[in-house]
């Protein structure tokens, strides 16, 4: 049973989506209270949040159905086309950021985004799977969800087949970077593979995983497929239960993506305990690097040496892409609760206890904080708390969404269970070569003791790791901090 604090976090985080979304059209802001524009990824998380609200009795099913229908109808009606202005999408994709009122592309720097469209579609397909009633309104939700997903022309963004481009600009055309593993775009490929109308071919997954070996290795005592910021180890797992299912790459490595994310979380925590950059407050219960707000793009002296600080940026600890300027985002730890509850629960409680007075408010945890940043200079965002450092002033939708959904998954596997009913997601996983676990067809489940044994072994390994980690954490209480973590060679 989770400590009572988590119920409070869930309720406040749910209210972020319920209260800040535009009641006229269902568009959810990228951030609040600054609320400059809507984010299509935020909308995907909002569509996922509403059923969590129903299940907890925070809104009625009727209210959530109304809000969901409003959103899906508006998404259907947003004008699409290649023009630079006055459109909200093209080829079934949507622009990353939309104007909160009209739903048009917010500005000329905003791209038509493949991965953000995928995050939106995960929410759309979640709604399709959840609202299974026989009445006309729930039927309309299912029909609209189908329509929106079928419209996305995934293959159009395959300019360098079989990989999918990060997006497109009406001014300059296709973005020259493609999504290659390993990162959050795992969910993009699964949705593109599962499409009934514009599917990419299975070799897309093969090529996406081809770069994995570059990111596989040992970091802070964990051997895993690395990506610096924790969001890359979380986003795909919000909707898909990767326990006991494996693609070819993970079969060869003998683990699954769930266990991989667990190792990433434990490595992040060990990095914070070792604290090679000597940032303030880092330790066993204050950790978690991901993308989020920061104070300012600036260089300042810290402990006698010049350090780079950033405003909104990806931050991470891993084998390759690392950036750490002392900024911690609570979502990094809290949304990892399914992977490593034995370290996430105490971290959440400690961050609430130590920083809650200024970090925890109406909608839960503000985006981020940096105890090491106390420079009296103009800030991009946030504020300085005397003696405590910098704290963000906004909540961010793509950081709030995983907090809410992952606590729900931890409690009763809610989001995962609903999503398992969605045939498109299942097809996408199968096309990517995933087998075992919940993907095993029922008639085959009896016939293949081999894969059952493998799955049971993987499950046992995961459980054993959890128990060992809990025991290890207990043992560490008696150790001085200095010998807790060995940084990588």
List each model region and its residues:
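Ser/Thr/Asn(+Pro)-rich, low-complexity disordered segments
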Residues: 1-489
């Amino acid at each position: 049973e989770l400590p009572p604090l988590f119920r409070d976090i869930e309720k406040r985080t749910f209210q972020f989506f319920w209260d800040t979304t535009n009641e006229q059209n269902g568009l959810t802001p990228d951030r609040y209270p600054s609320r400059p524009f809507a984010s299509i990824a935020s909308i995907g998380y909002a569509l996922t949040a509403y059923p969590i609200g129903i299940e907890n009795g925070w809104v009625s099913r009727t209210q959530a159905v109304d809000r969901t229908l409003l959103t899906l109808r508006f998404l259907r009606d947003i004008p699409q086309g290649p023009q630079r202005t006055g459109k909200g999408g093209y080829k079934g994709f949507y622009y990353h950021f939309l104007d909160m009122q009209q739903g048009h592309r917010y500005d000329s720097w905003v791209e038509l985004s493949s991965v953000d469209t995928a995050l939106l579609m995960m929410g759309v397909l979640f709604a399709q799977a959840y609202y299974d009633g026989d009445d006309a309104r729930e039927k309309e939700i299912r029909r609209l969800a189908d329509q929106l997903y079928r419209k996305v022309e995934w293959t159009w963004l395959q300019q360098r087949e079989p990989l999918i481009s990060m997006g497109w600009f009406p001014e300059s055309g296709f973005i020259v970077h493609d999504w290659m593993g390993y990162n959050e775009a795992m969910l993009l490929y699964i949705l593109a593979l599962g499409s009934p109308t514009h599917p990419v071919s299975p070799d897309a997954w093969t090529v996406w995983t081809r770069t994995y070996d570059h990111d596989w290795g040992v970091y802070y005592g964990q051997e895993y497929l690395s990506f610096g910021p924790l969001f890359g180890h979380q986003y795909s797992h919000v909707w898909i239960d990767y326990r006991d299912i494996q693609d070819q790459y993970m079969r060869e490595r003998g683990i699954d993506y769930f266990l991989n994310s667990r190792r990433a979380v434990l490595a992040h925590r060990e990095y914070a305990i070792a604290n090679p950059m000597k940032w303030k407050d880092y330790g066993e219960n204050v950790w978690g690097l991901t993308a989020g707000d920061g104070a300012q793009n600036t260089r300042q002296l810290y402990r006698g040496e010049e350090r780079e600080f950033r405003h909104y940026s990806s931050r991470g600890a891993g084998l390759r892409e690392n950036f750490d300027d002392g900024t911690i985002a609570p979502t990094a730890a809290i949304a990892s609760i399914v992977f490593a509850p034995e370290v996430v629960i105490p971290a959440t409680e400690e961050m609430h206890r130590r920083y809650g007075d200024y970090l925890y408010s109406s909608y839960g945890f503000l985006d981020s904080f940096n105890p090491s940043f106390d420079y009296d200079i103009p800030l991009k965002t946030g504020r300085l708390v005397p003696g405590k450092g910098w704290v963000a002033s906004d909540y961010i939708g793509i950081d709030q969404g995983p907090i809410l959904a992952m606590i729900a998954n931890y409690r009763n596997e809610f989001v995962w269970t609903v999503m398992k009913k969605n045939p498109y997601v299942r097809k996408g996983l199968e096309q990517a070569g995933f087998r075992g676990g919940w993907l095993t067809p029922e008639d085959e489940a009896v016939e293949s003791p081999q894969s059952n044994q493998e799955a049971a072994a993987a499950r046992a390994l995961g459980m054993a790791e959890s128990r060992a980690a809990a025991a290890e954490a207990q043992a560490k209480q008696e150790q001085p901090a200095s010998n807790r973590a060995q940084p990588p060679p």
